[in-house]
């Protein structure tokens, strides 16, 4: 539909491509299957559903919110004058994504291919179209042309996929979208689509000529790509700042299951989840990561797991999600205001929902420490740290809990992870000299 809407922007002059190019999408399909057998999920690079949903989530959705806020800014003076207070102060949180520009380039490139020929992507590159073409021989509906056909070829010229042959009465069913454009444009009303009951249709044979050499090249290319992606040294050299969403399954399975659709990032109410670039190699491109310096992970939200279509992020209830430990906060003493400059700062402790920050007397100054068994890596401390630039306390994937199945709560109990909110008193001083517990302001 997106390509159909965009075709009106371009001239009708097209370059006619040889039928041989139609085999490209089949080669891509074979290569992607071979890569999957080699352990690499590369579907997100060519799957139109993943590309479209990712474009909507990362690019079109933020633009829609921006347009809505700009429209509200125009209406605010009138709303204030009319006393419509709710409208006067209404505003939507503006989501931002780091790969918006790259996504725009990819989407624009696919659309611009229409300059060459209508639906270039669908005709020559789409592996999903190749798969549906293979399955078309089992299709229910068939294009039928009756005796009123005058062979005017109007249907042939109008077909967006070029599926109608030189004889307008026949069609390559493997290329036909069943869009009914030919039926609408036919001046003699000679075209109809009727249900057929034959499990194998003669007109549905694949409209490409695949040689054995080309088939083997596609297979070997896919296997080689799969090997290169899985053997990428950056895949194992995961950076300390790469934090996955709560409930994400183990990393190897996660990279295989995630289709990079962007649904979790769009659903994230704090805009914490951002698409990765090459943080863990090419294979991690567009996978979600938690950018906790930008925003913490809201503890009363589990939308990312609810919307994940492949359960790369498990759908956990709020209590279970709390124990899906994302990592552990680590204090960078060389940047911390208390450790480096002996200043009085309690912000990380004030922000921690589970009292995982405690203070000990060191060299006569109260200095912060992290209790690893009370930290689930939510990132409130990192997000609110007053140090300019990178925070002095950062969440690293140390002790992260990634389960493909089973209870996070039970696993947390086994590892002595306690995440109960403690009211009343914070144990600021655990060892050494100094006053006793200081009453919490909570």
Where do the language-model regions lie?
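Non-ligating segments of multi-cofactor redox enzymes
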Residues: 1-175, 180-442
């Amino acid at each position: 539909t997106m390509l159909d809407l965009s075709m009106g922007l371009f001239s009708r002059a097209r370059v006619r491509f040889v039928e041989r190019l139609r085999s490209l999408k089949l080669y891509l399909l074979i290569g992607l299957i071979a890569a999957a057998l080699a352990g690499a999920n590369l579907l997100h690079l060519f799957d139109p559903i993943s590309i479209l949903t990712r474009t909507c989530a990362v690019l079109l959705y933020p633009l829609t919110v921006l347009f809505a806020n700009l429209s509200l800014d125009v209406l605010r003076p009138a709303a204030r004058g009319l006393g419509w207070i709710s409208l006067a102060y209404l505003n939507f949180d503006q989501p931002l994504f780091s790969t918006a520009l790259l996504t725009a380039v990819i989407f624009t490139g696919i659309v611009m291919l229409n300059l060459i020929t209508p639906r270039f992507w669908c005709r020559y590159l789409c592996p999903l179209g190749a798969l549906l073409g293979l399955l078309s021989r089992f299709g229910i509906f068939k294009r039928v042309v009756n005796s009123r056909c005058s062979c005017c070829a109007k249907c042939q010229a109008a077909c967006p996929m070029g599926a109608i042959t030189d004889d307008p009465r026949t069609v390559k069913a493997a290329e036909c979208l069943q869009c009914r454009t030919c039926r609408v444009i036919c001046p003699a009303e000679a075209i109809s689509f009727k249900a057929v009951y034959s499990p194998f249709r003669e007109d549905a044979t694949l409209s490409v000529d695949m040689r054995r050499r080309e088939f083997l090249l596609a297979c070997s290319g896919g296997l080689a790509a799969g090997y290169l992606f899985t053997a990428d040294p950056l895949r194992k050299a995961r950076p300390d700042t790469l934090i996955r969403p709560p409930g994400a399954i183990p990393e190897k399975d996660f990279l295989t299951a995630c289709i990079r659709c962007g649904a979790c990032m769009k659903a994230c109410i704090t805009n914490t989840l951002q698409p990765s670039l090459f943080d863990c190699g090419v294979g991690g491109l567009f996978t979600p990561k938690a950018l906790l310096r930008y925003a913490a992970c809201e503890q009363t939200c589990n939308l990312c797991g609810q919307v994940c279509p492949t359960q790369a992020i498990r759908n956990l209830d709020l209590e279970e999600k709390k124990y899906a430990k994302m990592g552990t906060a680590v204090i960078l003493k060389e940047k911390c205001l208390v450790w480096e400059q002996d200043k009085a700062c309690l912000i990380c402790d004030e922000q921690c929902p589970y009292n995982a920050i405690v203070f000990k007397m060191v060299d006569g100054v109260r200095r912060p420490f992290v209790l690893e068994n009370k930290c689930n890596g939510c990132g409130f401390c990192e997000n609110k740290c007053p140090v300019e630039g990178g925070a002095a306390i950062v969440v690293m994937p140390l002790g992260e809990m990634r389960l493909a199945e089973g209870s996070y709560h039970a696993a947390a109990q086994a590892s002595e992870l306690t995440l109960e909110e403690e009211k009343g008193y914070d144990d600021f001083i655990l060892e050494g000299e100094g006053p006793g517990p200081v009453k919490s302001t909570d």
